[in-house]
Amino acid sequence: RIPFLMNFAKKIAIRSSKLRGCNMSFWREDFIKINGFNEGLVGWGIDDSEMIQRLHNIGIQGKRLKNTAIAYHIYHKEQDKSHIEINHIIEKETTEKKISFIEKGVNQYL
């Protein structure tokens, strides 16, 4: 993807409250403010969007970089999806109660 080609691409808002967890980066300070990923979530799914919601809850918005940044994906085996509904409930609670900090997160390792 080449920035020059962005001149020919569909224009989208640079700032956005809609983020996709599969390709994202953030400031370390903001990550620590929300205590990182919620390690209370089990299996595959929702961990990234739940964390993004907590970033939104402290006022952090994303910046879209479509066609202007390179993203790498590290291969990993798929995880168990049997807890996806429970994870959705936790994400919904994070949104409704405007939760910004979780107990079981990165603080365990700092």
Task: Kindly label every feature range from the protein language model.
Residues 1-17:
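Short, flexible, basic/aromatic active-site loop/helix in glycosyltransferases
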Residues 12-14, 35-38:
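A short, structure-level motif marking secondary-structure boundaries and short turns
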Residues 18-19, 23-35, 42-61, 66-67:
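A short, conserved alpha-helix in the catalytic core of glycosyltransferases
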Residues 40-42, 81:
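A generic structural signal for short coil/turn motifs at secondary-structure boundaries
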Residues 52-54, 61, 72-73, 91-94, ...:
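Short, surface-exposed, polar/charged, turn-prone segments marking secondary-structure boundaries
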Residues 65-82:
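Active-site donor/metal-binding and catalytic loop motifs
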Residues 68, 82-106:
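Catalytic core of nucleotide-sugar-dependent glycosyltransferases
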